[in-house]
UniProtKB/Swiss-Prot annotation:
Biased amino acid composition, Polar residues: 275-297, 517-562, 570-585, 757-782
InterPro entries: Arrestin-like_C, Arrestin-like_N, Arrestin_C-like, Arrestin_domain-protein
Skewed-composition ranges (Basic and acidic residues): 746-756
The protein's name: pH-response regulator protein palF/RIM8
Species classification: Eukaryota, Fungi, Dikarya, Ascomycota, Saccharomycotina
Biased composition (Acidic residues): 708-717
Organism: Debaryomyces hansenii (strain ATCC 36239 / CBS 767 / BCRC 21394 / JCM 1990 / NBRC 0083 / IGC 2968) (Yeast)
């Protein structure tokens, strides 16, 4: 390298370092890098559009194009990961930036290039004028790596940064090359300190060119390895029970006290209030309460629960983009409730921003999906089970937690109206659409079912489904009300699912639940299920039961286990048809499915009406037989009076006179058509000698030119009257040959008269004779 440099650069003392004058006429100064010496400087990756994982190796090249020969330059490459919080006028957080990691390596140049002057060497390296490429391979770290995202209030960014400059500038800026830390301990490094002090004044002219390449990193989250989420349960006790108990114990007449409180409670509920407070009054001094504990009134009150129990259950903890999150809600209430908008289920993303050491945190909420469900409590069991599902949007990025300044989490929020008073939703309860998004979204995938792995491209300009999300209900108003109950559970949005078998096994488990629930259906069970918005997907049956009329229009069967869209829907089983509803569904696999004939025979055997026999109609054409078969499949007509029965004739009854007349007329037409066809074919066979079914043994040759002209006229006539042959009904046993018109003689065609044009049903055998009248133009047709 030094020999190559010495050929293009003349040897001479570095006077610019000795004199300290920057305006000296030294020739070495022209080989230094400046603003006009670099034409292009950028980073080119081998796979620029790839999303990288922790531990991957990034390969690429640094391309450097110079306008002149350069000497004593250094090219470095840095891998930088940072978290940044932007400044905002309406936020109390100040702008802050924290580095996750910062690693720098030298691509070109000596490690001690700034110390070469003490050895008497003038130049350490140099580059010719032109293009230079420097390949590199960088391995990403495995720790402190979070998913790349750029949102409005901050960003998590990873970049490769290349820099080129003089060796003196890097010696001053690089801690590894700077000897200032050892100057107080070693007195022998005075030469280095003098060199650094001289090059400090050259930083203005030793400009450094930089190029930055943003890379996308994904922190992989395997949702199949996450633990199963625990159900969220909440128990609410009625505070009035304790008041009733104290007043009952202090009352002199227990019976009057019970009647009084039953009257008061009837104004607030639909049924009789619970009277189980007598169970706590079974003391020796309260004999009246014990005597009335077995009364019919107390027996009815004991059947009602004293507390309200709500349980929220989600089968899995992690989901992928595009998957459905099935949600199961069990409610045990103390009275009957019918509310059309009693339950609001929302998929929420919460962003938390902190300001580092000041412990100031700001939270921002965004509703991604929402479903409003009716709440119906069974008056007999005071229970209700609601099944619904929410789809994870395609623009949802993975859960980010553990990051120093930013965190993104997803929650399922369930808001229940337990008061029984219907909620009126108006326009003021909805979010207003906003132009700018608080958090980052990325564009919709064109094919969400394919290549879902590690393909994220988040940006702050996309506003996915902004019009749809603007219609969501703002639940902040109802959270502050006492009559509403709030349940939340966290779900994790991951990047991949290694155990694809779990999605297939949900099909088998759902089939078992289907067979079990077919026997356990009761008319008193009230189970409502709904699907949010347009999130229709091929799910499986998990729960069966009656649904409210308002929700039957968009009901979808559901399963407790989500099914990825990437899995082909070919393992779904359809429940067979049961002729008798009392048949056990457990014997489905053993009993064959009855065919159409068996079902029809069993129906006619058990029915009092005589079945209509299908006529055989061997003499009819195939088209008429198909029409008769279609008519037999039509629904039966209602029974008519005797007077009407004499005038009404079934079109498929073989014994009817009208049908016989129609058949006879059809046979006559067929005979006439067959005779005309036989006569034409016989003349045709006699003139040309073609093989036909009528004359299969003997063939003749044409005798004169007149017979040829007659046959050509007949062929031209068949071109226009060929539709008569298609409408004629031949016998099934006879075989018809295909006929193709001769379009080569179309130039000699003439129009027919009205008498010769036929529809194919009112023909007579003499049509060929009448059609023989042609002009002299047909003489040259041969």
């Amino acid at each position: 390298m030094r020999r190559a440099v010495s050929k293009i650069i003349p040897n001479g003392p570095p006077r610019f370092l000795q004199s300290g004058s920057l305006l000296s006429g030294d020739t070495n100064f022209k080989y230094r890098i400046d603003f006009n010496s670099v034409d292009e400087f950028y980073i080119s990756l081998a796979d620029p559009h790839r999303s990288w994982l922790p531990g991957d190796e990034i390969s690429g090249q640094i391309i450097f194009i110079s306008k002149k020969d350069l000497a004593n330059i250094v090219i470095t490459l840095s891998l930088i990961g940072s978290v940044k919080i932007n400044a905002s006028s309406h936020s109390k957080l100040r702008p802050v930036k924290e580095l996750l990691f910062h690693h720098t390596i030298k691509i070109y140049g000596d490690e001690n290039s700034g110390n070469n002057n003490e050895n008497g060497e003038e130049f350490s390296n140099g580059l010719f004028k032109g293009e230079h490429r420097f390949p590199f391979i960088v391995k990403l770290p495995n720790k402190r790596v979070f998913t790349s995202i750029d949102f409005g209030k901050g960003s998590i960014k990873y970049s490769l940064k290349a820099a080129v400059g003089n060796a003196s500038s890097f010696a001053n800026d690089s801690p590894a090359a700077s000897p200032l830390s050892d100057s107080n301990n070693n007195n022998n490094n005075t030469t280095k300190n003098n060199f650094i002090s001289k090059t400090k004044n050259l930083n203005f002219h030793n400009s450094v060119y930089t190029s930055e390449k943003i890379i996308t990193l994904i922190n992989p989250i395997d949702v199949s390895k996450l633990p199963r989420s625990k159900p969220k349960r909440l128990i609410i006790k009625d505070p009035r029970l304790s008041k009733k108990l104290s007043r009952t114990q202090s009352s002199t007449s227990t019976l009057n006290t019970v009647n009084t409180f039953n009257t008061l409670s009837s104004n607030n509920s639909d049924t009789t209030t619970n009277g189980e407070f007598h169970s706590n009054g079974n003391t020796p001094g309260n004999s009246a309460s014990q005597s009335n504990s077995n009364s019919p009134l107390n027996g009815l009150d004991n059947a009602r629960p004293q507390v309200i129990k709500v349980a929220l259950e989600i089968p899995e903890r992690g989901f992928l983009r595009g998957e459905l999150i099935p949600t199961k809600l069990n409610i045990n209430h103390s009275r009957k409730i019918q509310d059309l908008n009693g339950i609001i289920v929302t998929l929420v993303r919460v962003c938390r921003l902190s300001n580092g050491h000041e412990n100031m945190v700001e939270s921002f909420r965004k509703d991604l999906q929402q479903s409003v469900l009716p709440l119906y409590v069974d008056p007999n069991t005071f229970q209700s089970e609601i099944n619904t599902n929410l789809r994870v949007p395609a623009d949802a990025f993975p859960t980010i937690s553990g990051c120093p300044l930013v965190s993104f989490q997803y929650f399922i929020e369930v808001l229940i109206n337990l008061s029984g008073k219907s909620l009126i939703l108006d326009s003021s309860n909805h979010h207003k659409p906003s132009i700018s998004t608080d958090e980052a979204n990325h564009s919709l995938l064109e094919n969400p079912s394919n290549d879902l792995k590690y393909k994220f491209n988040f940006n702050s300009n996309a506003s996915m489904n902004q019009n749809e999300r603007s219609g969501f209900i703002n639940t902040d108003k109802y959270k502050r009300m006492k009559k509403f109950l709030l349940l939340t559970t966290e779900v994790i949005i991951g990047t991949n699912r290694s155990n694809e078998r779990s999605a297939y096994t949900s099909n088998e488990r759902s089939n078992e639940l289907l067979h079990d629930n077919l026997n356990s259906i009761s008319p008193t069970s009230r189970k409502s299920s709904s699907v949010s918005g347009s999130n229709d997907s091929p799910l499986l049956f998990n729960q069966t039961g009656s649904t409210p009329p308002s929700q039957q229009g968009h009901q979808q069967p559901m399963s407790l286990n989500p099914l990825s869209e990437a899995i082909p829907a070919n393992n779904f089983s359809t429940p067979p048809y049961f002729e008798n509803q009392q048949d056990s569904p457990l014997n489905i696999a053993d009993t064959p499915i009855p065919g159409y004939e068996e079902v029809s025979n069993n129906y006619h055997a058990n029915s009092s009406l005589a079945p209509v026999q299908m006529p055989t109609h061997q003499h009819l054409s195939e088209k008429e037989q198909i029409r008769a078969h279609e008519a037999s499949l039509l629904p039966s007509a209602p029974p008519l009076d005797d007077a009407e029965e004499t005038e009404t004739i079934s079109p498929i009854d073989k014994n009817n006179e009208i049908l016989e007349n129609i058949e006879e007329s059809g046979e006559e037409v067929n005979q006439l058509n067959n005779e005309s066809n036989d006569s034409a074919s016989s003349r045709h066979s006699q003139s040309f000698g073609f093989f036909t079914y009528q004359n299969s043994t003997s063939t003749t040759t044409p005798t004169n030119h007149e017979s040829l002209e007659e046959e050509e006229e007949e062929e031209e006539d068949n071109l226009y009257h060929s539709n008569n042959l298609s409408n004629s009904h031949a016998e099934i046993d006879s075989e018809s040959t295909d006929w193709v018109p001769n379009y080569e003689t179309a130039n000699h065609d003439i129009l027919l008269e009205n008498d010769h044009v036929s529809t194919g049903t009112n023909m007579h055998p003499g049509r060929n004779a009448n059609s023989s009248a042609r002009g002299p133009q047909q003489d040259n047709s041969s």
